Structure formats: C-alpha cells, structure tokens
Amino acid sequence: MQHPRMFNQTSTNAKKPNGSDSSIKVANHSNQRQMSANHASLTIGGSRNPINQRRSMSTKNIGSTLIVSRRNNHYLDMKEEDSKENLTKIISNNQNEEDTEVSVKVSVWFHELRDFTEDIIIDENVIPTGVQAGQVFELQSLDEGSSKKFVFTVQKRNLRSATNDTDYTEASKPKLQISLMANPFQRLLDLAPRSQVQLKRLVKLESVTVDSVEIFIKDVNLSRDAMWNFSASMIGNCVYIDQRLLYLGSRVGVTKHIYKNGKNVTSGYVDKNTKIIYRSESAKITLFVQLSREMWHFEEDGEIMFHKLINNLFPKIFRRWRETNTHHSITIVLFTSIDLTDIPWTNLGPGQRPPQRRDFFRVVVDQVNSMHWDRIMEDLRLEFANFKRDTMLNLDDDGKFIIENGTLPAIKGNLLEAVNLGLTSLNNRFQNTDLKHSISHIMVITPGTGLFDVEHDLLLETSKKMSSVDSSLDIICLSQPPLHVTPLFRYIKEGKVCHCVPLWCDISFFIDKVQQESQWIPRCKIYELQMMGVMENEASDARIPRLHLNNYGKTLVEIMDEYDSAVFKPIKRIPKPAQVEFKQVKPKFQAPELKNATATLSLMFENKPLLQPSNSSTISLATGTVANPSKDTSALSSLYYINKNSEEIKSPAPSVRSETPVSTIRAIDSYRKSAGSPRLIRGETMFKRKEEIPNTEPPSALSEKNAASARKKSSILAEPEQEISTGSFWIEISNPSQETTTNVLQRSQSSRWSNIFPNKIQRKLIKWRSFQAPASLPTTTGVFPSTNQLQTDYTFQIYTVFLNSDNYWELKSTHSLMREMIQLRLMLGFQVCYGERVDKAEAERKPSGNVDAIIKYFPEEHNYLGSRIYLAFGDEIHRIFCDYNGNINVQLYRKIIENDEKKITLGQTKLKPYFPLIRTRYTDEYTPARIDAIADNPQKFNWNQFDQLLAGFDDAMPEEKKQFHKMKFVVMPTDIPKNAYFVSNEKLTPEEIRVEGLRKLIGVIERGKYKHDSSQKKKSRRGSDVIFYTGNLYDFLNEEAQNYDITGTQPALMIPESSRFNKTIKLPDLAQELQDRNTGLTLVDRTWHFKRHLHCFVGSELVSWLVDCFEDIETREDATTYGQNLMNKGLFKHVESRHGLLDGHFFYEFSDEYVDKTDREKPSWFGSKKIDGASTPQSNSSPRIAGQNDLQKIISASNLRSETSSTTDSMGRKRKKFILSRSVKFDVDPLKKSFRPEFVTVHYDRVHNPEHCYHIRLQWLNATTKFIEDTITAWTRLCERHGLKLVETPWNELCSLPKLSPFHSFVDIKLSVNPWTDPDLCDDRILSSNRYYYHSYFLKQMGYYLDNRSTSFFSRENIDIGYSWGKPTFRYAQFIHKTGFYIVELRDNGDFFLAPNNMHLTRVRSSTTLVGDYENYSKGVLADSQTVMLNFRAACQNKEFLKETFTLAKSNWKDDYFSQII
C-alpha cells in the first residue's frame, strides 16, 4: 500500500503527455539534468535491460550515485527466473519514497566546535528525496578494509538550513554535503577530510538496533528516576562511542560501549527493547579486605597472598582509575574473625563455624578520593604489618599480653557480617545526600577460593537486605579458581548440608600471570610439596604417583568444540523409561470458597459482577484506605484465577498415572508450595527414574540438552519452572563439582541485576569494568512472578489517588501526578517490569486487562489515559493504572511472610546482636560498634501516604516522616579575595564586605522563590530578611521580646496608599515622616562591638521604606540614589562619617537640625524595663534591624500559672516563642529546562552573629539533583567574592554519626590541662558566668567557629526558640574549623569529640572546576585536612601551650566576652 502523501505525487508524474507509462519515477526538482542510460539504469537481479533510460534525476553533486532499494547485505537478491509479477511488486513498493532505502556517495567534511555546536551537519538535498528530521542514515567508508559504520538520526538542528551559520558555510564550504565533528569522529571512523563515503537512508532498523548501551557518568548524582527519563529520551535516536550525552541541558555522561549480537559496535539505533546500563566513574566504594589465615600463606610460585594484593591487584586497580580519571570515594576496611574456642577449625564440618568468635574491623581510609593511591598504599602496608599483632594480642589480668588462639580461614570467616556492616550506611535512602557521587558499591577481597560457610538465617537476612538496596557486591578471590561453581555458600539447614549460589553478588579471580590452556594449575595446597627445595624432590618422603589419564579423557578445547557442535543438533527426546507420570494430587493451596460474592477481589472474574469502583467499600479514595484481605484469602486467591472456570481452579494439575514413587510426588508438592524461606532454584532435576539405568551421560537426572524437551512434554514440569525463576535470593546446588558455571549463569537470569550483562557476551574471570565503573541497578527488569505465584504467594491491596488542584508540588494534571508516582518509586529502588509474564498477568485481568496499554517508559501527555505500569521492589509489586476518567488506581502485591521468615522477624530471632570491634582511622583502640549491623534493616515506606502526599493531601503523612532528602550548609568567614566585592568611592572593612555578601546571598534566595505566574511581579522588592547582632543571642532575643506589646502585634511599616509621597516632598516634612513612631523608621540605640550608636537606623531599612512609600520610586537602586541625594543635602549621615548611603547593614543618624526633639526625650530601649514584674538588665546586643514583622512571637493563651505549660516559665511569666529561620520554596530551574517544576525548600537563619556560622538548610523530595548542584555552585561563587566560604556539614549532630556510619572516623580528645581544676585558672567569676569560657577561647584560638548551640541553651527563662525546619535537638555545642574540614563537639565534661567533615572534603575533592591540576589539588586538600586534626590533637596534649592560652584567656576576660553556649 502506498503512502497517501506519496501516492498523489506519483500519480501526477505517472502519465506523460504522450500517454506513455514509466516503471520507476522520482519526484522532479527545479534543477534537473539528463543522465546517460548507463548512469541512470537500475539493475535488479539478472535483468540487463535498463529501466526508463530517459529518466531525469536530481542530484546535489554530479558524481553522486543513486541506488534504490539496495542493501550491503543484499536483502534484495532475485534470480533471473523470478517472475515479472514479483518484479512489478518490488517496483511498486519502491514508489513509496518514505519506505525506500537510498544510497549516495558523498564527501565527508569535519568541523570544530567553534564552527558548529552540533555533532552532525547535513544538507537537506544530499539525496534526491530530501533529508527530513527523524530519518536514520548509515555512513560507511568506501575504502577497502574499513568496516566501520556510523548510524545517526537526523534532528531538525542537524539540518544545514537550521544552523545560524548558513552564510558562513556557503562562503567557506559551498560543497558541504555532510560534516562531522572532528573530535571524536575523525578518530572513531578513521576517515581523512574529504573522504568518499556511502550515505544510506535506512528504513528497516532491525539490522542496526543495538542490544545494550553502557553510559558512564561522573561527578554527578544521577538518580534512578533521572536514568529512567534519560533512557526514555534516547529511544528513537542513535548513539555512538564516546558520545557526550546531555540531560535537561546538562552533560551527564559518555557512551562507552555498544553491543549487538554479542559484539562491540561503533554506533547503533536505540529502541524500547535496548538495555541501557549506567556505570559511575564517581561512585562510593567500600572495599573490604579479609585478612584471614590464608593471607599469610604463599602461592606455588612463592608469592605471599598479601604481597599479591598489595603489589599486583591494588596497583592495577588504582592504575585503571587514574588512567580513566575516575573520582571514586574510597573506604578501605581490613577485617578478620578470631576463633575463641579450643577446637581446631579443621575439626569443624562443612557448614559449621566456631560458636565463639571475635570480629575485628580496621578502617584504613575513610571516603578518600581514589587519586590518593600512593597514600592509600602506604597506609595499607603499615596496617597489614600491625593488624595481626593488634587483633591477636590481649591483656590478661596480670597486665601481660597473651596471644589468643588464631585467625580463622576465609571459608569459616565473617564475610556476611562484613557485608551487613557495609550496608548500614545505605539503609536510609534519604540521609547524607551526595550530589557528586552516584551509586554505592561494595567490594570484598578475600584470599579464599569462593567457598564460604555461613549460617542459614544470616544468609537469608543478608539476601533480603541486598534485594532492598541498589548497591552491588563484587567478591575478588586471590586464589586460583576452584573446580566447583562459585561463589558458593554452604550452610546447614535441618541437619543437612546445603550449597547455593547467591544471585546478589558476582565473583572474580585475580590471576596475574598469563597461563597457557595446556598448563596444569594445582587447585589444592600440599604443605610438603610447597616446602620442598629444587633439589629435594628426589629425597622427599612424599611420594605421589603420576596421574595416568584414561583413554576417554578429553582436553578443555575438545570439550568446548564438542559442546559447540552439539548446540545445533536436534533435540533428543526423553527415552520411554524416563517419562514421569503421576497420580492425581490434591494441591495444598486451592482457591478458597468466596462467602461473599460481592467482595472486592471476587468482582474481577468472568462469572462475577464487574468491578464497580464507585461503590466498592474497600477501594480507597482521597483518604487512602486500603483493602484488607481476609484471613482465609492468601495472595490473590480469587483475584488471579482469571479466565478460568471452576473446574480448572479445583484441578490445576493434569491427570496422570502412578508410576512415580510417592516420595517424589511429595517432594514435588513440597517444592511447589514450600513454606521454607526463599524460593530456591535447584540445580538438579526434580524428577528421577523409577529404575536407575546405566548411562554414560553426566550423573544428573536430566541433562541440560533434554531438559527443555522435558519441560515442553510435561505441563507438570513447566509450571514449577516458571514459579522458581523469580523472587529468589539464591540458586540451590546439589553437587557443586558437577554443576557448570554456564548452567548457573543461565538460571541466574531471575536476578534483578541480569540486565546489566549484554547478551551473548562471555563472562571474564576478573571483571575489571565493574571495578573501574560500578553499574547502577537497572531501571527495568524482566523478573516477574508467574500467575500461579501471584495467586498463592502474594496479598493484594488497592487504593485510588485523586489530584488536589492546590498542591505543594505544583502538579497540574493527572499525567504529572502519575509520572511523579512512578519516578518516586524508581528513585527509592523499584524497577519497571516487562516481558511475557507481565503481559500474561495483565491479559488475564478482568475486566480492565489490556496488554497493549502496558508501558515501559512514560508516554506523551495526550497518550497516558488507560496506561498501566508494573514496578517491583523486594517483596512488593505495584501496578499503577490511570483510567480514562483521570483517576489513578494503585494495586499493591506483597509477598506473604512464610513460616521460617516469621520465626526471624516476628518471634524470637535466632540471630544474635552483632557488635563487632571497630577501630576507625585515627583511634588507637578497638571499640564495640554502636549499631547492630544485622538488626539494622532498610527503611520501609507507606506508599499510600506517599501517593496521597504527592496528590496534594499534606495531612496524609505525619510531619515527623516528612524528612526527605536534606542538606545543611554553613557560611563562614574566610580571607578576602583580591577580586572582592567593592563599592565605588567607598572603603569597606572585611566585616562589612562579609555582611554585605551574606545579605546578597539571602537576596538571591528571596528572589529565587518559585513563582506560579512569571508575569506577576511585585514593585516592592525588600532587602534581605536577616537581623545581625553581636554579643549574646539570648540577651538580644530578650530585648526583642520587650519591644513587642502584650498582644503580640507589631506596628505596620507600610502607610496607606492614599498617603504615598513623591520626590517633591520637602526635607523637614520627610524628616518628620521618617521619624514618626507609627509609620516611620525604627530609631533605636544600636551596639556593635561594644560601641553604642544612639537613635540610629539601618541603610537597608531606609531603602525599603523609600520603595514602599514613594510612588515615583520603583527599584531599590532608585531608592539608593534618591537617599544619597538626601544625604548630600544634610538630612542624615553615617554614624562614623565613613560611608555614603549603602543598601546594607550600615548605621545612620539624622542631622541635628532635622532631629525630632520630642522623640529624643523618650526613654531608650536599652534602659531598665519591667515586664510582668521582672526586671531585665541592660545589654550590649543590638535590637532588631530589618524585616522584624516576620520575626514571630507567640504568646500562649493557656493558664499563666501552669508550671507544665510550654509557654510559661517557672515564675509564671509568659514565654515568647521566636522562629529564628525562614523557609522559602526556591526554584532551582529558573530557565525551565525541566519538564516539571523543580524546587527545594530552603531554610535560612533570620538572626546572625558575624562571628558565628550562618546556616542554610535544603529539603526536597523529587527535585533533579543536577539543578540543586548548579544552584549550590552559584551560591559558592557568590560567597567567595565576599570573603565567605560555603561548607556542607552533616544534618545531624556529630555524636550521632557513629550510629549512622560505623566506619566514620572520629577522635576523643581530653585536655591535658583542666581549667576547672587548675588552681591558677579556676576563677569563680569566670566559671559562674560561663562554665566553658576557657574551652570557647581555646577553640577560637584554634580557628573554630560556633555552629550549633546545645539544646539546653534554647530552654532558658521566658524565651522559647524554634526554627522553620523543626526543634533543635543538639545535645552538645558544635564548632567547625575555618577550613571546613573538621568538626568538633564540646562535651559536658569538657572533652572534645573531633571528626572529619567528609561531606565537605568529598565536595572539595570532586570539584574539578576549582583548579586545573585536579590530582595535585586533591592531594593538597588531603594533606591540609590531616594537618588540622594533627595540630588540634597536639595542642590539646601540649601542657605548656594550654597553660599559656588559658592564662591569656583569663587576662582578657570580660563579663560579656563570650556568650553562654552550653
């Protein structure tokens, strides 16, 4: 059938004036030339006759050749005897130019980035039919021996006419047909400029569609929902090697590998079935090194295991990281397990471990950049030399060191315990957000052979955790690979030794030397042979007879050749004696009898009434109520017996005869419906012959060659095969020596990580790519339960979500809501399910099942109605469906907790609390961990609450659970740069520059508020809403409270619209208005650094007043100019006569001739005042300055005499509550690059002392992290220009970090001189006013700024302090070093708790934009950070220095020098 658009064109040209017809026609163009018969001929098959020799064609170049419907691989290959009818059919199809593959010969040009920003520029007329956006072309060199092909999709921006440099190209490159970016295409395609290439338009894209694409990302935290959206944007486009990819206008990654049919290709086309894999070159890697007994053994070549690690493996890994310029954050931990029993470990049986063990973990480096490989190697060698001594020596009662037993071998070690300990920092997905690193990866290096004895319960618990986090695990073995399948876990269950291969980890074997296939490698260690010398082999007592191979022995090469030849042989049928037949077996689980035919779950069947959402009592509406399945109803029971009649339900198994033993039947039945822990994929076949028949085949019941045939022949075999292939944690192996790795890999496709492996690619012995760039958990998966599993193993719940038009997330349509619901799940670990099982489950749904409506990626807005998507995570499956009325239905399937699992999770657990001994980086002793690594489980979420929250119902989730992604920043003083902010004709002090910079930063935040309508603009743009003060915060707030009247109302600054002024007002009148107590400025006595300025105002407040009250002043700049004119006329002046009018925190006073004398006679704010009968002494702190109307004070209406009231103090006085921070919905995407609103909640302090840290906190749920990172970078640059430093710090207090991250380094430090007990320093006047005066003075001398006050500070007398982000809960006062590298806590007993600020260190080391030489700069940062810690610890231990410092502090003491902070 012809395309309608082309049919009219062809019909017009079909007939000539003379009535003759033509076989093939091409649309005429304006510039045509007649071609010779030989040139214009089209040869098809063996036909020698030219077709329409007088045909006219249009070409761009004279030498161009037109080939119609021809492919390189000769899809069109017709013989001479082909009928004329077939030929006519082909020619008729070619009349549709849209479906015709056209090839031309062109010259390729190359351009630089300065010429064009696009990778490809193509002329629309390069082919006669024209080039249109969306078409796919293939470019191939005509040089012999060059097979590289480049496939690309034409976008509108790639067309030559769409470029802005058309005139330039016409002048410099008039014959340009196609131009490629010189870098990388010239190297990638190995083409010289002006080379002749063949350009072919492709119609059938199957030949160029790729199977998988690997994208490497670096220095960006690309969340999984962003990966899903990014993958969706790539569908329908082409990719090529080393292509730089952009997402929402920002560069996020580079295409490194493209696979098709098991081969690496240069480029290809991406469709919805292409697997897109993301690997991170800036990951967080936790590397465990197991120092078991074998680590001190040596190989057959004499190399000690640890030397093999430290001299071979680590250097190669670091070298690859350095060559690829990766920016990983590395944590290296040494661990081992010490046997405390007197039983030799060799007496332990398979699967057994010593009952009494002591585990040790030594942190070598903690979140250090991978560039510091030299320092890491040095620390590793040092720690290895001391590790055995530190772990095996123990003090006895007599104070002597004794050796406690020995180190366990790797097979009996604590591998799973180490994995659980590494997962503790990953269980909470919302804590410690890192915007520079994507993906967390765990690597375990062991000297073992890949066989580990474990406890079954611990293996199950670890498997559950690994299936609930998106972190991968690599095990690297230093030994030779064994002859059995690996990794192999061995455990005892019900008295039986079991073997299994976990699906959540991968294993590698490091072999340094290249070995030949014929070389024999010993797999076992014989001590006598290892200790023999070269000349001792004749005299040795060990006599080992030579191994004589039997005649039937085959080499590995022969076995592989035999396997390859057997692949294409016909499938063998199972012999007659091997057929299995069974009696009728009644299944354990049957469809329950439905007592109520109108129940919700029963409404979905053919024989039941259709589902009625409007009147179903169990379907949630806006309130989010979920359906509670009955006690008798397991899983989907009634829901998923769909399209089946009652007979099928009652008898799911076919009728068979009784030729199989009863034990086998019981085993099958038990296997199908086992209540055991995980669904185990068994390596052996489930059925055996009744009579064993000798056979030369391998000793398995059914070989792999006829297993497929057996499954096809028997439905009883096929169904269990479907059931056991999903939801599994491991593959059970009956005989590890007989199981091949290939078989295990084929059955391991049920792993949720299976999509990262390209099809038909041979797995290598060591996975260097995984070490170089760990892979992210794929956003899609083919793993899905069978229909039978959904019926029996899952419970079902349903609720409906409606969009509230007034919602915080600015969602305007159900389309946006559904997309956000999917993205939130992907971000928290879910995967999109696809495949035959998903289609089957959807097809059997009644009445709304529609396979064609299942989506893998989100559709366009006009196509989303009726779409449904399946997502899976752990033991949950979510089906999100948008009906045609715009309502979103969410159906949740949760796996039933089976009996063995209930014993662990609900009853008395078999797993003991696990608190191993950990020694962090800077500590000297091993101390017990502060977190139970095994009991700590990943965070679970109430998805009904989440969905209702996204829909706009804020009360659906409690406030304490709304702590999502969060970051905390502090702004600290630093050196003034040379290009610092300045004001013309003004000389600002460093403090004034910093204060102005802080005001500008808050101004940027205020101006960046998310706007619903960008056209709405307010005339009045008030300045920064920050109140500056010096001295004691409590005294300042107490005086602020005195200035509020008893009702809590404040005088309005704005005067009525009818009383607005203009610039014609006279100075005396303006002076009177400015000094009016109700509508004028606030004239108070202000103190700054112990110097008092009477009756003054702030410059920024005057500017705001002028903007608000003058009708002819529109901007703050106009107000500043007008105010300067007033100052020049003598209306007011600077308090120190140093500045003109500046829109900032500068003090001014009225000239004497304009001062209102009546106002001066009134008492000052700083005089003694009475409030509720209590006197408050005069203070040196400054009062409110600007924006005071937003500083909230809440007076309780409760009984003033109530001692328990939170708003009254012990004396019955009314307590004033102050909110010292303000929250702003900040737009991080002001240029609207994203398809959705992108904003975060910013909390900033409204009260600030320039000598302390200023706080900015960010909170968000679903914003794109790249926009947040760009915003923080812009803030950092602004701060640097004003002598400020923006430093990221932990959200929680420092003392809680060891509970959140057990490997985080910290140091407990005591002062060698205690100022509280030293007779020369103990002064009652000082200690009574401020107990921690000496400690504060010492910290200030060491360069530390106050970060957070202790909670006790905020509960004093009649002041109640809160923040917009919540109530402060810091137990101790916290200080940050001026570099931002270290944080110190001041404990109640006067000791210090010091820890590195890893967040800031990671951010600084990852900021490659700061300097060009990244490696040297990063190493300098590491040296500086360690120097800070070493200097502080040395100062605390130096008695002379402390005595001198404390003596100086005592001599400089003043009553108000330091504020009370504890």
From Swiss-Prot:
Pfam families in alphabetical order: DEP, DEPDC5_CTD, IML1
Region span, Disordered: 1-55, 688-717, 1166-1185
Molecular function as annotated in GO: GTPase activator activity
Biased composition (Polar residues): 7-55, 1175-1185
Domain (DEP): residue spans on this chain: 1077-1152
Chief subcellular location: membrane
SUPFAM superfamilies reported in the protein's UniProt record: Winged helix' DNA-binding domain
Annotated Gene3D superfamilies: Winged helix-like DNA-binding domain superfamily/Winged helix DNA-binding domain (1.10.10.10)
This protein's record includes keyword Transferase: no
Bilayer topology: Peripheral membrane protein
Keywords: Membrane, Vacuole
GO annotation, biological process: intracellular signal transduction; negative regulation of TORC1 signaling; positive regulation of autophagy
Family, per entry: Belongs to the IML1 family.
Protein name according to UniProt: Vacuolar membrane-associated protein IML1
Organism: Candida albicans (strain SC5314 / ATCC MYA-2876)
Organismal lineage: Eukaryota, Fungi, Dikarya, Ascomycota, Saccharomycotina
